[in-house]
């Protein structure tokens, strides 16, 4: 058994531990959402504080990006990620002992830092520890599994709270976090030489400046962040569109989200199982028409035959499938088609993505309340069309980088 563990630690148990950590982080929001009103009532707090459980979680996710990337470049990926898993576990456990809404929200913000550790350090380690094609396929598998959480989380949470107190849900998540912590401690490989670069404010600022001056990174960050807009704006505003304006029940609304997340899961499964080389430009360009057809359905369908949810869900799901086919490759290209410190590149990319997502959600919300469904969907269409041009720029820069590397080897 010890020999089997040693042989498969990096290739099997490390990805499993990371998936469990990522899955638990998602569940900490999705599992409690159906009972968030119960939380507010237990603490005799104002119901207007309910959305803060999500917004503060996201704020925690943005708080440490600037630090963790450069830090992991200098002291190693492993100590940073296992520290993050431990912090997440303790924050979930502490939630069981909260006695006020303020304490609960502080715990939620600390739990949100898991986004920083996973996205900035965990995903980079996967890409560094495995070859290009295997790394992309493994990330596709991780994404497929983790995206099950937004589908089953609310349904499972609602069912469990018929039998247990909401604090028990955080106990379950804390156990998952602890198991992932132990798994990462025992199985995570170290992909960075520790102490190779000293940690100083000057060197960190220099690294960030170099990243944001790199044109390949800028094209990659623009492509990825703009690609998120159609899905994230829909996920954020769809409750208002479908429940408040459309009259759907909460259970009906929950089922309308399944095709969107399910499309990404199916796309990632196809990449992991059937696509031999997901970095092939021809494969990448074949996914673009699928995205554009989905975006066209958002407008044309609602113009010709308006429906409460059909065209919006169908168009967004088709777009999600198309972009899901190439998302892992876009991340790989942006992170590794340069000679910059990967932790800093990952941190910079995540900061851009979160900023664009936040702004796009607010723009989408404004367009819906001031213009209605068609102006709201036009935001997705505009973002999707711009992505075609930024993707062309990214692939061109990647080709130049690969040609330069070949020339150096010869």
Curated annotation (Swiss-Prot):
Entry GO MF terms: sodium:proton antiporter activity
Gene Ontology CC annotation, any one: plasma membrane
Cytoplasmic side: 1-11, 70-78, 125-140, 189-216, 273-282, 329-348, 395-410
Membrane topology, Periplasmic segments: 33-48, 100-103, 162-167, 238-251, 304-307, 370-373
Topology relative to the membrane: Multi-pass membrane protein
Domain of life: Bacteria
A Pfam family the protein falls into: MFS_1
Record GO biological process: response to antibiotic; xenobiotic detoxification by transmembrane export across the plasma membrane
Gene3D superfamilies reported in the protein's UniProt record: Multidrug resistance protein D
Keywords: Antibiotic resistance, Antiport, Cell inner membrane, Cell membrane, Membrane, Transmembrane, Transmembrane helix, Transport
Subcellular location: Cell inner membrane
Chain ranges passing through the membrane: 12-32, 49-69, 79-99, 104-124, 141-161, 168-188, 217-237, 252-272, 283-303, 308-328, 349-369, 374-394
Chief location category: membrane
Similarity comment: Belongs to the major facilitator superfamily.
Role according to the record: Proton-dependent efflux pump. Confers resistance to a broad spectrum of chemically unrelated substrates.
Name the record gives this protein: Multidrug resistance protein MdtM
Organism the protein comes from: Escherichia coli O157:H7
Organism taxonomic ancestry: Bacteria, Pseudomonadati, Pseudomonadota, Gammaproteobacteria, Enterobacterales
């Amino acid at each position: 058994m010890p020999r089997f563990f040693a042989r498969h630690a990096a290739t099997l148990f490390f990805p499993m531990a990371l998936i469990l950590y990522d899955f638990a982080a998602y569940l900490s929001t999705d599992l409690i959402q159906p009972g968030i009103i119960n939380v507010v009532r237990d603490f005799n707090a104002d119901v207007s504080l309910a959305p803060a459980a999500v917004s503060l979680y996201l704020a925690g996710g943005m708080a440490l990006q600037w630090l963790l990337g450069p830090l992991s470049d200098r002291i190693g990926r492993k100590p940073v990620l296992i520290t993050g898993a431990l912090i997440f576990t303790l924050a979930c456990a502490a939630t069981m002992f909260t006695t006020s809404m303020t304490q609960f929200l502080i715990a939620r913000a600390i739990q949100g830092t898991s986004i920083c550790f996973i996205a900035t350090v965990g995903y980079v380690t996967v890409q560094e520890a495995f070859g290009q094609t295997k790394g992309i396929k493994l990330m596709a598998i991780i994404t497929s599994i983790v995206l099950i959480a937004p589908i089953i989380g609310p349904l499972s949470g609602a069912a469990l709270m018929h039998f247990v107190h909401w604090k028990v849900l955080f106990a379950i998540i804390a156990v998952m976090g602890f198991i992932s912590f132990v798994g990462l401690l025992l199985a995570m490989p170290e992909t960075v030489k520790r102490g190779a670069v000293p940690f100083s404010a000057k060197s960190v600022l220099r690294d960030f400046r170099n990243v944001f001056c790199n044109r390949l990174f800028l094209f990659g960050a623009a492509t990825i962040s703009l690609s998120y807009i159609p899905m994230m704006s829909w996920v954020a505003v769809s409750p208002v569109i479908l429940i408040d304006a459309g009259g759907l029940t909460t259970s009906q609304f929950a089922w309308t989200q399944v095709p969107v997340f399910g499309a990404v899961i199916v796309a990632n499964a196809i990449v992991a199982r059937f696509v031999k080389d997901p970095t092939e430009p021809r494969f990448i360009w074949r996914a673009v028409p699928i995205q554009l057809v989905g975006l066209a359905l958002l407008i044309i369908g609602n113009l010709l035959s308006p429906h409460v949810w059909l065209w919006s869900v169908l168009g967004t799901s088709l777009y999600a499938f198309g972009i899901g086919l190439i998302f892992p490759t876009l991340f790989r290209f942006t992170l590794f088609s340069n000679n910059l410190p990967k932790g800093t590149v990952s941190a910079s990319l995540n900061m851009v993505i979160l900023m664009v997502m936040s702004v796009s959600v607010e723009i989408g919300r404004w367009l819906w309340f001031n213009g209605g469904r068609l102006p709201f969907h036009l935001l997705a269409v505009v973002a999707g069309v711009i992505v075609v041009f930024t993707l062309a720029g990214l692939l061109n820069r990647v080709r130049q980088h690969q040609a330069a590397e070949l020339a150096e080897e010869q």
